Protein backbone atom coordinates (compact mmCIF):
# COMPACT_ATOMS: atom_id res chain seq x y z
CA UNK A 1 0.00 0.00 0.00
CA UNK A 2 1.17 3.50 -0.78
CA UNK A 3 2.21 6.11 1.76
CA UNK A 4 0.96 9.56 2.59
CA UNK A 5 3.24 12.58 2.51
CA UNK A 6 3.25 12.62 6.31
CA UNK A 7 4.25 8.96 6.51
CA UNK A 8 7.11 9.50 4.07
CA UNK A 9 8.58 12.42 6.03
CA UNK A 10 7.99 10.78 9.42
CA UNK A 11 9.58 7.46 8.45
CA UNK A 12 12.58 9.19 6.86
CA UNK A 13 13.38 10.78 10.23
CA UNK A 14 13.02 7.83 12.61
CA UNK A 15 16.44 7.57 14.26
CA UNK A 16 15.57 4.95 16.87
CA UNK A 17 12.58 2.61 16.82
CA UNK A 18 12.94 0.22 19.75
CA UNK A 19 10.15 -2.33 20.16
CA UNK A 20 7.48 -1.12 22.55
CA UNK A 21 8.96 2.38 22.69
CA UNK A 22 7.89 5.68 21.14
CA UNK A 23 10.07 6.29 18.06
CA UNK A 24 12.76 8.96 18.26
CA UNK A 25 12.82 11.40 15.35
CA UNK A 26 15.79 13.37 14.09
CA UNK A 27 14.99 17.10 13.94
CA UNK A 28 16.31 19.08 10.97
CA UNK A 29 15.52 22.60 12.18
CA UNK A 30 14.92 24.06 15.62
CA UNK A 31 13.48 27.57 15.78
CA UNK A 32 13.74 29.45 19.07
CA UNK A 33 12.20 32.62 20.51
CA UNK A 34 12.39 34.52 23.78
CA UNK A 35 9.32 33.18 25.59
CA UNK A 36 9.66 29.38 25.66
CA UNK A 37 13.45 29.04 25.65
CA UNK A 38 14.87 30.47 28.93
CA UNK A 39 14.17 27.39 31.08
CA UNK A 40 15.43 25.12 28.29
CA UNK A 41 18.82 26.84 28.18
CA UNK A 42 18.91 26.81 31.99
CA UNK A 43 18.44 23.05 31.84
CA UNK A 44 21.43 22.67 29.52
CA UNK A 45 23.53 24.84 31.78
CA UNK A 46 22.61 22.90 34.92
CA UNK A 47 23.46 19.57 33.27
CA UNK A 48 26.66 20.82 31.64
CA UNK A 49 25.38 20.19 28.11
CA UNK A 50 25.90 22.08 24.86
CA UNK A 51 23.57 22.69 21.92
CA UNK A 52 24.00 19.59 19.78
CA UNK A 53 23.60 21.25 16.36
CA UNK A 54 24.05 25.02 16.45
CA UNK A 55 24.00 25.11 12.63
CA UNK A 56 20.41 23.83 12.69
CA UNK A 57 19.19 26.13 15.47
CA UNK A 58 17.94 29.65 14.76
CA UNK A 59 16.59 32.20 17.23
CA UNK A 60 14.71 35.48 16.93
CA UNK A 61 12.71 37.88 19.08
CA UNK A 62 9.04 38.30 18.28
CA UNK A 63 6.43 37.75 21.01
CA UNK A 64 7.45 40.52 23.40
CA UNK A 65 8.99 43.10 21.11
CA UNK A 66 7.56 46.58 20.85
CA UNK A 67 6.22 47.54 17.42
CA UNK A 68 6.78 51.27 17.99
CA UNK A 69 10.45 51.32 19.02
CA UNK A 70 13.57 49.15 19.03
CA UNK A 71 14.01 49.84 22.75
CA UNK A 72 14.26 46.50 24.56
CA UNK A 73 12.71 48.09 27.65
CA UNK A 74 9.52 49.26 25.94
CA UNK A 75 7.31 46.22 26.60
CA UNK A 76 7.90 45.98 30.34
CA UNK A 77 10.21 44.28 32.79
CA UNK A 78 9.33 40.65 32.02
CA UNK A 79 9.71 41.22 28.29
CA UNK A 80 13.08 42.91 28.81
CA UNK A 81 14.30 40.02 30.95
CA UNK A 82 13.20 37.43 28.40
CA UNK A 83 14.88 39.23 25.52
CA UNK A 84 18.10 39.90 27.44
CA UNK A 85 18.14 36.26 28.52
CA UNK A 86 17.82 35.10 24.91
CA UNK A 87 20.76 37.31 23.91
CA UNK A 88 22.88 35.88 26.74
CA UNK A 89 21.88 32.27 26.02
CA UNK A 90 22.55 32.52 22.29
CA UNK A 91 25.94 34.11 22.89
CA UNK A 92 26.89 31.46 25.46
CA UNK A 93 25.75 28.46 23.41
CA UNK A 94 26.71 29.76 19.96
CA UNK A 95 23.19 29.92 18.53
CA UNK A 96 22.40 32.26 15.63
CA UNK A 97 20.15 35.08 16.88
CA UNK A 98 18.27 37.63 14.82
CA UNK A 99 17.64 40.17 17.58
CA UNK A 100 15.51 43.32 17.38
CA UNK A 101 18.26 45.25 15.61
CA UNK A 102 19.03 42.58 12.98
CA UNK A 103 17.88 42.89 9.38
CA UNK A 104 16.44 39.35 9.55
CA UNK A 105 14.44 39.84 12.75
CA UNK A 106 10.80 38.90 12.55
CA UNK A 107 8.06 36.56 13.67
CA UNK A 108 9.69 33.15 13.82
CA UNK A 109 7.24 31.58 11.35
CA UNK A 110 7.77 34.40 8.85
CA UNK A 111 11.54 34.59 9.26
CA UNK A 112 12.20 30.86 8.78
CA UNK A 113 10.53 30.45 5.38
CA UNK A 114 11.70 33.76 3.91
CA UNK A 115 15.34 32.90 4.65
CA UNK A 116 15.10 29.40 3.20
CA UNK A 117 15.67 27.85 6.63
CA UNK A 118 12.43 25.94 6.01
CA UNK A 119 12.76 23.34 3.24
CA UNK A 120 10.55 20.48 1.99
CA UNK A 121 10.79 17.11 3.70
CA UNK A 122 12.29 18.47 6.91
CA UNK A 123 11.25 17.97 10.50
CA UNK A 124 10.91 21.39 12.14
CA UNK A 125 10.07 22.22 15.74
CA UNK A 126 9.65 25.37 17.79
CA UNK A 127 8.32 26.17 21.23
CA UNK A 128 5.25 27.70 19.62
CA UNK A 129 1.94 26.12 18.63
CA UNK A 130 1.82 27.70 15.16
CA UNK A 131 4.95 25.92 13.97
CA UNK A 132 2.55 24.05 11.67
CA UNK A 133 3.00 27.05 9.33
CA UNK A 134 6.15 25.46 7.88
CA UNK A 135 4.13 22.45 6.73
CA UNK A 136 3.19 24.56 3.71
CA UNK A 137 6.54 23.43 2.29
CA UNK A 138 5.85 19.73 2.74
CA UNK A 139 7.78 19.61 5.99
CA UNK A 140 6.62 17.98 9.22
CA UNK A 141 6.47 20.95 11.58
CA UNK A 142 4.89 21.16 15.01
CA UNK A 143 5.05 23.02 18.29
CA UNK A 144 6.76 21.61 21.37
CA UNK A 145 6.87 22.40 25.08
CA UNK A 146 9.78 23.92 26.98
CA UNK A 147 11.09 20.57 28.27
CA UNK A 148 11.08 19.31 24.69
CA UNK A 149 12.89 22.47 23.57
CA UNK A 150 15.67 21.52 25.99
CA UNK A 151 15.72 17.94 24.69
CA UNK A 152 16.05 19.05 21.06
CA UNK A 153 18.75 21.58 21.95
CA UNK A 154 20.71 18.81 23.69
CA UNK A 155 20.15 15.89 21.30
CA UNK A 156 18.65 17.18 18.01
CA UNK A 157 16.04 14.45 18.45
CA UNK A 158 12.56 14.10 19.91
CA UNK A 159 10.26 11.25 20.89
CA UNK A 160 7.22 11.39 18.66
CA UNK A 161 4.49 8.82 18.19
CA UNK A 162 3.00 8.27 14.75
CA UNK A 163 -0.17 10.32 14.31
CA UNK A 164 -3.39 9.46 12.49
CA UNK A 165 -3.76 11.00 9.04
CA UNK A 166 -6.51 13.24 7.68
CA UNK A 167 -6.96 14.51 4.14
CA UNK A 168 -8.75 17.82 3.72
CA UNK A 169 -9.52 18.39 0.07
CA UNK A 170 -10.87 21.71 -1.17
CA UNK A 171 -12.25 20.87 -4.59
CA UNK A 172 -12.53 23.35 -7.46
CA UNK A 173 -11.69 27.03 -7.58
CA UNK A 174 -12.68 29.78 -5.15
CA UNK A 175 -14.67 32.81 -6.25
CA UNK A 176 -13.06 36.21 -6.72
CA UNK A 177 -12.15 37.87 -3.42
CA UNK A 178 -11.86 34.63 -1.48
CA UNK A 179 -8.49 34.19 0.22
CA UNK A 180 -6.48 31.51 1.97
CA UNK A 181 -7.79 32.85 5.29
CA UNK A 182 -11.37 32.35 4.16
CA UNK A 183 -10.53 28.82 3.01
CA UNK A 184 -8.99 27.76 6.31
CA UNK A 185 -11.70 29.41 8.42
CA UNK A 186 -14.32 27.59 6.34
CA UNK A 187 -12.43 24.34 6.91
CA UNK A 188 -12.37 24.87 10.67
CA UNK A 189 -16.03 25.84 10.60
CA UNK A 190 -16.77 22.44 9.07
CA UNK A 191 -14.43 20.30 11.18
CA UNK A 192 -14.93 22.31 14.41
CA UNK A 193 -12.01 23.44 16.54
CA UNK A 194 -11.46 19.87 17.77
CA UNK A 195 -12.14 17.93 14.58
CA UNK A 196 -8.49 17.32 13.80
CA UNK A 197 -7.40 16.22 17.27
CA UNK A 198 -4.90 13.37 17.04
CA UNK A 199 -4.32 13.85 13.31
CA UNK A 200 -1.71 15.26 11.00
CA UNK A 201 -3.63 16.93 8.19
CA UNK A 202 -2.70 17.11 4.52
CA UNK A 203 -4.44 19.93 2.66
CA UNK A 204 -4.99 19.30 -1.04
CA UNK A 205 -7.30 20.01 -3.95
CA UNK A 206 -7.29 22.61 -6.70
CA UNK A 207 -8.11 25.51 -4.37
CA UNK A 208 -5.05 24.65 -2.26
CA UNK A 209 -2.58 24.13 -5.10
CA UNK A 210 -3.78 27.40 -6.67
CA UNK A 211 -2.51 29.26 -3.59
CA UNK A 212 0.81 31.09 -3.41
CA UNK A 213 3.29 30.01 -0.74
CA UNK A 214 2.08 32.88 1.44
CA UNK A 215 -1.47 31.55 1.13
CA UNK A 216 -0.39 28.00 1.85
CA UNK A 217 1.40 29.18 4.98
CA UNK A 218 -1.81 30.85 6.15
CA UNK A 219 -3.69 27.56 5.74
CA UNK A 220 -1.09 25.39 7.49
CA UNK A 221 -0.63 28.00 10.22
CA UNK A 222 -4.19 27.37 11.36
CA UNK A 223 -4.08 23.56 11.21
CA UNK A 224 -3.58 23.67 14.96
CA UNK A 225 -6.88 25.56 15.26
CA UNK A 226 -8.82 22.49 14.17
CA UNK A 227 -6.92 20.50 16.77
CA UNK A 228 -4.38 18.90 14.42
CA UNK A 229 -0.80 18.12 15.37
CA UNK A 230 0.46 19.53 12.08
CA UNK A 231 -0.66 20.47 8.59
CA UNK A 232 1.14 19.73 5.33
CA UNK A 233 0.86 20.65 1.67
CA UNK A 234 2.86 18.70 -0.91
CA UNK A 235 5.67 20.74 -2.49
CA UNK A 236 5.42 21.60 -6.18
CA UNK A 237 6.86 24.10 -8.65
CA UNK A 238 5.29 26.96 -6.68
CA UNK A 239 7.28 25.78 -3.66
CA UNK A 240 10.54 25.40 -5.56
CA UNK A 241 10.22 28.83 -7.17
CA UNK A 242 9.66 30.42 -3.76
CA UNK A 243 12.69 28.76 -2.16
CA UNK A 244 15.23 29.23 -4.95
CA UNK A 245 17.83 31.88 -4.22
CA UNK A 246 16.96 32.36 -0.56
CA UNK A 247 19.77 32.71 1.96
CA UNK A 248 19.85 29.13 3.26
CA UNK A 249 18.50 27.39 0.16
CA UNK A 250 20.72 24.84 -1.60
CA UNK A 251 22.65 26.01 -4.67
CA UNK A 252 24.18 24.49 -7.79
CA UNK A 253 24.22 20.70 -7.95
CA UNK A 254 22.85 20.54 -4.40
CA UNK A 255 19.79 22.48 -5.57
CA UNK A 256 19.17 20.09 -8.46
CA UNK A 257 19.48 17.06 -6.18
CA UNK A 258 17.20 18.63 -3.59
CA UNK A 259 14.46 19.37 -6.12
CA UNK A 260 14.59 15.80 -7.42
CA UNK A 261 14.04 14.52 -3.88
CA UNK A 262 11.37 17.10 -3.11
CA UNK A 263 9.39 15.95 -6.15
CA UNK A 264 8.95 12.56 -4.44
CA UNK A 265 7.28 14.20 -1.44
CA UNK A 266 3.67 13.60 -2.35
CA UNK A 267 1.02 11.17 -1.22
CA UNK A 268 0.88 8.00 -3.30
CA UNK A 269 -2.34 7.41 -5.23
CA UNK A 270 -3.10 4.20 -3.32
CA UNK A 271 -2.32 5.65 0.12
CA UNK A 272 -5.05 5.46 2.74
CA UNK A 273 -6.00 8.25 5.16
CA UNK A 274 -7.69 7.62 8.50
CA UNK A 275 -10.18 10.41 7.79
CA UNK A 276 -11.21 12.48 4.78
CA UNK A 277 -12.95 15.88 4.70
CA UNK A 278 -14.03 17.59 1.48
CA UNK A 279 -15.20 21.12 0.74
CA UNK A 280 -16.45 22.72 -2.44
CA UNK A 281 -14.34 25.83 -3.01
CA UNK A 282 -17.14 27.59 -4.88
CA UNK A 283 -19.27 27.52 -1.71
CA UNK A 284 -16.72 29.45 0.37
CA UNK A 285 -17.62 33.06 1.12
CA UNK A 286 -15.68 35.73 3.08
CA UNK A 287 -15.48 34.42 6.64
CA UNK A 288 -15.76 36.15 10.03
CA UNK A 289 -15.61 34.45 13.41
CA UNK A 290 -18.41 35.36 15.80
CA UNK A 291 -17.44 33.34 18.88
CA UNK A 292 -14.48 32.47 21.06
CA UNK A 293 -12.84 29.71 19.06
CA UNK A 294 -11.98 29.68 15.34
CA UNK A 295 -14.64 27.05 14.64
CA UNK A 296 -17.36 29.52 15.61
CA UNK A 297 -17.35 31.18 12.21
CA UNK A 298 -19.87 32.28 9.59
CA UNK A 299 -19.89 33.82 6.15
CA UNK A 300 -20.07 37.60 6.40
CA UNK A 301 -23.57 37.63 4.87
CA UNK A 302 -24.99 35.09 7.32
CA UNK A 303 -26.82 36.00 10.55
CA UNK A 304 -25.19 35.36 13.91
CA UNK A 305 -26.34 31.84 14.87
CA UNK A 306 -28.67 31.14 17.76
CA UNK A 307 -27.55 28.65 20.42
CA UNK A 308 -30.76 26.70 19.73
CA UNK A 309 -29.47 25.93 16.23
CA UNK A 310 -26.83 23.61 17.69
CA UNK A 311 -28.04 20.07 18.39
CA UNK A 312 -25.00 19.15 20.44
CA UNK A 313 -25.53 20.33 24.04
CA UNK A 314 -21.85 21.18 24.47
CA UNK A 315 -21.84 23.32 21.32
CA UNK A 316 -25.09 24.96 22.41
CA UNK A 317 -23.66 25.90 25.81
CA UNK A 318 -20.45 27.10 24.17
CA UNK A 319 -22.45 29.30 21.79
CA UNK A 320 -24.44 30.83 24.64
CA UNK A 321 -21.26 31.65 26.53
CA UNK A 322 -19.53 32.99 23.40
CA UNK A 323 -22.40 35.31 22.47
CA UNK A 324 -22.46 36.73 25.99
CA UNK A 325 -18.70 37.29 26.01
CA UNK A 326 -18.67 38.80 22.53
CA UNK A 327 -21.65 41.06 23.23
CA UNK A 328 -23.56 39.76 20.22
CA UNK A 329 -27.23 39.02 19.59
CA UNK A 330 -28.29 35.95 17.62
CA UNK A 331 -30.03 36.70 14.35
CA UNK A 332 -28.31 40.02 13.79
CA UNK A 333 -25.67 40.71 11.16
CA UNK A 334 -22.07 41.25 12.22
CA UNK A 335 -22.11 44.39 10.08
CA UNK A 336 -24.39 45.97 12.70
CA UNK A 337 -21.54 46.04 15.23
CA UNK A 338 -18.83 48.67 15.05
CA UNK A 339 -15.20 47.68 15.40
CA UNK A 340 -12.87 49.62 17.68
CA UNK A 341 -9.53 48.28 16.49
CA UNK A 342 -8.15 46.54 13.43
CA UNK A 343 -5.02 44.41 13.35
CA UNK A 344 -3.33 43.26 10.15
CA UNK A 345 -0.40 41.08 11.14
CA UNK A 346 0.61 37.88 13.02
CA UNK A 347 2.27 34.70 11.76
CA UNK A 348 -0.97 34.00 9.89
CA UNK A 349 -1.20 37.12 7.74
CA UNK A 350 1.82 39.46 7.89
CA UNK A 351 3.68 38.57 4.71
CA UNK A 352 4.09 40.80 1.67
CA UNK A 353 0.98 39.48 -0.11
CA UNK A 354 -1.07 40.25 3.01
CA UNK A 355 0.31 43.79 3.09
CA UNK A 356 -0.53 44.23 -0.59
CA UNK A 357 -4.08 42.92 -0.14
CA UNK A 358 -4.76 45.37 2.68
CA UNK A 359 -3.16 48.24 0.74
CA UNK A 360 -5.43 47.68 -2.27
CA UNK A 361 -8.42 48.24 0.02
CA UNK A 362 -6.85 51.18 1.88
CA UNK A 363 -5.59 53.16 -1.12
CA UNK A 364 -7.25 56.55 -1.40
CA UNK A 365 -9.53 55.95 1.58
CA UNK A 366 -9.56 56.90 5.27
CA UNK A 367 -9.81 54.84 8.44
CA UNK A 368 -13.07 55.52 10.31
CA UNK A 369 -12.65 58.18 13.00
CA UNK A 370 -13.43 55.82 15.89
CA UNK A 371 -11.07 53.03 14.74
CA UNK A 372 -7.41 52.46 15.60
CA UNK A 373 -5.88 50.36 12.82
CA UNK A 374 -2.45 48.69 13.00
CA UNK A 375 -0.46 47.26 10.11
CA UNK A 376 2.37 45.12 11.49
CA UNK A 377 4.71 43.47 8.95
CA UNK A 378 5.92 40.03 9.94
CA UNK A 379 9.62 40.71 9.55
CA UNK A 380 12.19 43.35 8.74
CA UNK A 381 12.40 41.90 5.25
CA UNK A 382 8.64 42.19 4.72
CA UNK A 383 8.74 45.73 6.09
CA UNK A 384 11.58 46.72 3.74
CA UNK A 385 9.86 45.23 0.71
CA UNK A 386 6.53 46.87 1.56
CA UNK A 387 8.25 50.23 1.94
CA UNK A 388 10.09 49.76 -1.35
CA UNK A 389 6.67 49.27 -2.97
CA UNK A 390 5.26 52.35 -1.24
CA UNK A 391 2.70 50.41 0.76
CA UNK A 392 3.63 52.17 4.00
CA UNK A 393 2.74 55.52 2.40
CA UNK A 394 -0.65 54.19 1.31
CA UNK A 395 -1.38 52.97 4.83
CA UNK A 396 -0.21 56.12 6.59
CA UNK A 397 -2.13 58.41 4.23
CA UNK A 398 -5.26 56.36 4.97
CA UNK A 399 -4.78 56.68 8.73
CA UNK A 400 -3.37 53.24 9.50
CA UNK A 401 -0.41 52.94 11.89
CA UNK A 402 2.63 51.42 10.15
CA UNK A 403 4.52 49.48 12.80
CA UNK A 404 7.78 47.59 13.36
CA UNK A 405 7.81 43.77 13.02
CA UNK A 406 6.59 41.55 15.85
CA UNK A 407 3.76 39.35 17.05
CA UNK A 408 1.98 42.51 18.20
CA UNK A 409 -1.75 42.33 18.91
CA UNK A 410 -2.06 38.61 18.17
CA UNK A 411 -1.54 38.01 21.87
CA UNK A 412 -1.47 40.25 24.92
CA UNK A 413 2.27 39.87 25.63
CA UNK A 414 3.39 43.33 24.54
CA UNK A 415 1.96 46.84 24.42
CA UNK A 416 -0.42 46.17 21.52
CA UNK A 417 -3.65 44.91 23.04
CA UNK A 418 -7.38 45.42 23.36
CA UNK A 419 -9.09 47.15 26.25
CA UNK A 420 -12.12 45.57 27.96
CA UNK A 421 -15.01 45.01 25.52
CA UNK A 422 -13.13 46.51 22.57
CA UNK A 423 -14.02 44.77 19.32
CA UNK A 424 -11.25 43.93 16.87
CA UNK A 425 -11.15 42.77 13.26
CA UNK A 426 -7.96 40.73 13.33
CA UNK A 427 -5.97 38.73 10.79
CA UNK A 428 -4.48 36.57 13.55
CA UNK A 429 -5.32 32.95 14.33
CA UNK A 430 -7.01 32.81 17.73
CA UNK A 431 -10.13 34.47 19.09
CA UNK A 432 -10.09 32.94 22.57
CA UNK A 433 -11.38 34.93 25.53
CA UNK A 434 -8.72 37.46 26.53
CA UNK A 435 -6.35 36.47 23.72
CA UNK A 436 -5.79 40.08 22.60
CA UNK A 437 -6.35 41.63 26.01
CA UNK A 438 -8.57 41.13 29.02
CA UNK A 439 -12.24 41.02 27.97
CA UNK A 440 -11.26 41.93 24.40
CA UNK A 441 -13.49 40.71 21.57
CA UNK A 442 -11.67 39.22 18.58
CA UNK A 443 -13.10 38.51 15.13
CA UNK A 444 -10.79 36.63 12.75
CA UNK A 445 -10.82 37.76 9.10
CA UNK A 446 -8.61 38.08 6.02
CA UNK A 447 -6.35 41.13 5.48
CA UNK A 448 -8.72 42.63 2.90
CA UNK A 449 -11.72 42.15 5.20
CA UNK A 450 -9.80 43.71 8.10
CA UNK A 451 -8.76 46.75 6.07
CA UNK A 452 -12.31 47.23 4.82
CA UNK A 453 -13.64 47.05 8.38
CA UNK A 454 -11.15 49.73 9.42
CA UNK A 455 -12.44 52.09 6.75
CA UNK A 456 -16.16 51.32 7.09
CA UNK A 457 -15.97 51.16 10.89
CA UNK A 458 -17.77 47.81 10.84
CA UNK A 459 -17.62 44.50 9.00
CA UNK A 460 -18.48 44.58 5.32
CA UNK A 461 -18.61 42.02 2.53
CA UNK A 462 -15.37 42.52 0.61
CA UNK A 463 -17.12 41.23 -2.51
CA UNK A 464 -19.23 44.42 -2.49
CA UNK A 465 -16.26 46.73 -1.89
CA UNK A 466 -15.93 49.45 -4.50
UniProtKB/Swiss-Prot annotation:
Catalytic activity: (2R,3S)-3-isopropylmalate = (2S)-2-isopropylmalate
Gene Ontology molecular function: 3-isopropylmalate dehydratase activity; 4 iron, 4 sulfur cluster binding; metal ion binding
Keyword set includes 4Fe-4S: yes
Enzyme class: lyase
The UniProt record lists the keyword Iron-sulfur: yes
Cofactor requirement: [4Fe-4S] cluster
Keywords annotated in UniProt: 4Fe-4S, Amino-acid biosynthesis, Branched-chain amino acid biosynthesis, Iron, Iron-sulfur, Leucine biosynthesis, Lyase, Metal-binding
This protein's pathway: Amino-acid biosynthesis; L-leucine biosynthesis; L-leucine from 3-methyl-2-oxobutanoate: step 2/4
Residues engaged in binding [4Fe-4S] cluster: 347, 407, 410
GO biological process: L-leucine biosynthetic process
Alphabetical list of InterPro entries matching this protein: 3-IsopropMal_deHydase_lsu, Acnase/IPM_dHydase_lsu_aba_1/3, Acoase/IPM_deHydtase_lsu_aba, Aconitase_4Fe-4S_BS, Aconitase_4Fe-4S_dom, IPM_dehydratase_rel_enz, IPMI_cat
Cofactor note as given: Binds 1 [4Fe-4S] cluster per subunit.
Superkingdom to which the source organism belongs: Bacteria
EC number, UniProt record: 4.2.1.33
Annotated function: Catalyzes the isomerization between 2-isopropylmalate and 3-isopropylmalate, via the formation of 2-isopropylmaleate.
Database matches in HAMAP family: LeuC_type1
Subunit organization: Heterodimer of LeuC and LeuD.
Family the entry assigns: Belongs to the aconitase/IPM isomerase family. LeuC type 1 subfamily.
PANTHER family per UniProt: 3-ISOPROPYLMALATE DEHYDRATASE, HOMOACONITASE, MITOCHONDRIAL-RELATED
Protein's UniProt name: 3-isopropylmalate dehydratase large subunit
Gene coding for it: leuC
